[in-house]
């Protein structure tokens, strides 16, 4: 197996992009990554695109061919990858494996979602849950994560204020991210007084409905410096599955897919949680920021809330979490999220993150899950 490097990244602004089409968003991200990498479209051997539900959001399937055609990249092989909200992370992993195996040399891995072209995106999002046991019974993702939050509060004493701090820190970071959907700060009081969605989760505990796209260019590590002076190396790419339905979990305060993917990633990279300088976690709801730092091994079980409350997860803390603003404030266009996380880590390791830069960052991690944790992808990168 060959070592793999990231030589180019790009991300559109995330938000309610009414005047930008699905086709133009993904083309903007792809061409931006190609330019950043210093390659030509003709250099690309293959494309992998993460997308959860274009068929429901924009009534368009067969998007792999559509994107290659619209971007002027035909006839390269183009493959759509779907794993709910982890679609981007698995598209990245597919591209990494294609290069590592020697099957392709230069690959683009991208992600895109256009969520605002429907009146109500909830039915499309609900397809990421168990249809028979959850969606058809009226269960929504806010209510599922609310149950996880309530149980964590019961088991470990996690407080409402600690949940709010996840959002506060994300917005603090996003205020320095020009690509973020919500680049403004919020207070604990604002989070706790926002509209109730599913007790104990309020509106400002929840990631938004977003449009956006992101892309990365991958190549063999020994070729990377032919294109860039600042390659970022893939140290590990791991994926795990878990139960899709929440009621099947042995413990709803732990996402087993995250635990297993992280364990495999650390083993592959020959690293420990203490070696990580920053991490982009999948905080679709505030409780998942807390669960993520526990399941990834950064703190002991039950200590996640305290880590946010004490400032451990701030940019200048022991383990900076979501310098981009995370899903909560940067935005969460489902299929693009896993790629956008990787782009942020690359910018951080290059020292190109501006006011949100983690000082001296050498090693970064991304954590991307689907649904309530039926799928997890964990990647580790280094300078």
Curated annotation (Swiss-Prot):
It comes from Methanothermobacter thermautotrophicus (strain ATCC 29096 / DSM 1053 / JCM 10044 / NBRC 100330 / Delta H). CoA binds at residues 206-207, 209, 328. The keyword Acyltransferase applies. The lineage of its organism: Archaea, Methanobacteriati, Methanobacteriota, Methanomada group, Methanobacteria. Catalyzes the condensation of two acetyl-coA molecules into acetoacetyl-CoA. Functions in the mevalonate (MVA) pathway leading to isopentenyl diphosphate (IPP), a key precursor for the biosynthesis of isoprenoid compounds that are building blocks of archaeal membrane lipids. This is Acetyl-CoA acetyltransferase. Pathway: Metabolic intermediate biosynthesis; (R)-mevalonate biosynthesis; (R)-mevalonate from acetyl-CoA: step 1/3. Belongs to the thiolase-like superfamily. Thiolase family. Gene3D superfamilies: 3.40.47.10. One of its GO terms (molecular function) is acyltransferase activity, transferring groups other than amino-acyl groups. Disulfide bonds: none annotated.
